[in-house]
A protein has these predicted regions:
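Formylglycine-dependent sulfatase
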Residues: 1-211
């Protein structure tokens, strides 16, 4: 079977901890989401979908394996536990002839675990990754170091990853992790293997708390 002619390209936009009702399309008065609204108008909106587990890592494991928490072995926020899943959403796409690409956050462990991604432009939150390896740098850190002349922090002082206090991003907007994730996703599409369809995961760290 020629995958180029029988399978459409697939892009999965995967934000972190985005409330299901935070779309202006759904009538939320406090947020403006014109680009996501456009996708809603052109596609299908599922308003009665629920996560099998309410915590980040465990929900991600269910999402990419198609299994429930009992089967994945993750019922809560169990960080630092290796992801040993031989069959994932990405391996299924890869085995079907797709080029599998990630741009942004995955929150796997180890952070560089690909789990079926052939191309991985990785963002890993600085405070998370360096808990396990003080010298760890993801692709975004390398980019930020180059652009800022050595500064690699991707957050601001005194701002917790799960707190309520916020501060202004200290760098230019194009250096923000969300902007980098989008840029790498676009670059991945432009440089993809033209002989194969592609599956692209676009993993945004935001609007994860405190935002």
């Amino acid at each position: 079977m020629d995958a180029r002619h029988n399978h459409p390209n697939v892009i999965m936009i995967f934000p972190d901890q985005w409330r299901g009702d935070c779309l202006s399309y759904l009538g939320n008065p406090d947020v403006e989401t014109p680009n996501l609204d456009a996708l809603c108008y052109e596609g299908v909106v599922f308003e009665k979908c629920y996560s099998p587990v309410p915590t980040c890592i465990a929900a991600r494991a269910c999402m990419i394996t198609g299994m429930d928490p009992d089967s994945t072995g993750r019922h809560g926020y169990r960080d630092g536990v290796p992801w040993n899943y031989p069959v994932t959403l990405m391996t299924q796409f890869r085995d079907a002839g797709y080029q599998t690409i990630n741009s942004g956050k995955t929150h796997f462990f180890p952070d560089r675990a690909n789990l079926g991604f052939e191309v991985n432009h990785l963002y890993a939150h600085e405070m998370h990754a360096q808990k396990f390896d003080p010298d760890f740098r993801c692709d975004f850190h390398d980019y930020l170091r180059k652009e800022t002349g050595g500064e690699v922090r991707d957050t601001v002082d005194e701002m917790s990853s799960n707190g309520w206090y916020t501060k202004v991003w200290p760098h230019a907007e194009h250096l923000h992790p969300s902007a980098w994730t989008t840029s790498m996703a676009i670059e991945s599409i432009e440089k993809r293997d033209p002989t194969r369809p592609f599956f692209l995961n676009v993993g945004y760290h935001r609007p994860h708390p405190p935002y």
